[in-house]
């Protein structure tokens, strides 16, 4: 199983417009964060999680021109608005890209981007969208899904299992439910939203995430969806063993 963090930043990215690096050292390349997205690959099957506004640059950096499916965690702009770039993936595949989203997210996508799913102006649809079930198999990847609180909406929490390796992905969450605990407990790698140190209404702060780590006991925890207050080197020095800041281009192969 190979996992690549395509983007590790929050909705504004780092630096924010105006060259705002906040507390992040501009000389550290791992502080430059595009909007959050993930790529999971196993035995020839590639799954893209979310189509961030930075998707084109993210896939170019990863040297990836084809994905076999897309899963959307939720309908917020920073996780969706690169959807038009799936046209190139459509051309690479030669057929509409299989896409999956929970029912509310799928409805929002169809409303905002009808042309992507129906075609328009003589152009064919580029995505074949299905409702994301609680369990899904894509190639040899077994995927389990739970609904996660994220302010007034929910996001899809994902667990990928293949070849005895388990990967959890929990972005855009505001609380930990029993279903989430069951999904993520003891995973080999847990990639989790950790927006900043100060509390936030719809994302977890660092102290909250570290409490979850103590409870869930993943083998390795990687922080993502971080804002300009979360300097890479500072986090590396501060975090306990087994917990690390993610960055754009972070990879693991197990």
Locate each region found by the language model.
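Catalytic metal-binding/acid-base residues of hydrolase active sites
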Residues: 54, 76, 174, 195, ...
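Active-site-proximal loop/helix segments of hydrolase catalytic cores
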Residues: 152-155, 163-193
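Binuclear metal-dependent hydrolase catalytic cores
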Residues: 1-170, 236-254
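Binuclear metal-ion centers of metallo-dependent hydrolases, dominated by the metallo-beta-lactamase
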Residues: 133, 177-254
């Amino acid at each position: 199983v190979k996992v690549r963090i395509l983007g590790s930043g929050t909705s504004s990215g780092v630096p924010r417009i105006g060259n705002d690096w906040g507390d992040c050292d501009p000389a550290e390349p791992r502080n430059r964060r595009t909007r959050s997205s993930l790529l999971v690959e196993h035995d020839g099957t590639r799954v893209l999680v979310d189509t961030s506004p930075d998707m084109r640059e993210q896939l170019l950096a990863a040297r990836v021109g084809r994905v076999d499916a897309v899963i959307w965690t939720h309908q917020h702009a920073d996780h969706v608005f690169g959807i038009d770039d799936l046209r190139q993936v459509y051309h690479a595949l030669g057929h509409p890209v299989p896409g999956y989203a929970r029912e509310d997210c799928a409805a929002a996508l169809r409303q905002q981007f009808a042309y992507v799913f129906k075609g328009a102006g003589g152009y064919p649809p580029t995505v074949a969208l299905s409702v994301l079930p609680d369990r899904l198999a894509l190639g040899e990847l077994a995927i389990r899904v739970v609904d996660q609180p994220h302010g007034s909406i929910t996001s899809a929490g994902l667990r990928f299992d293949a070849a005895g390796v388990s990967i959890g992905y929990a972005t855009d969450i505001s609380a930990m439910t029993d279903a989430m605990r069951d999904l993520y407990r003891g995973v080999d790698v847990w990639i989790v939203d950790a927006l900043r140190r100060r509390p936030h209404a719809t994302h977890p702060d660092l102290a909250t995430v570290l409490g979850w780590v103590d409870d869930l006991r993943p083998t390795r925890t990687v922080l993502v969806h971080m804002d300009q207050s979360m300097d890479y080197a500072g986090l590396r020095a501060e975090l306990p063993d087994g917990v690390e800041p993610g960055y754009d281009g972070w990879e693991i192969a197990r």
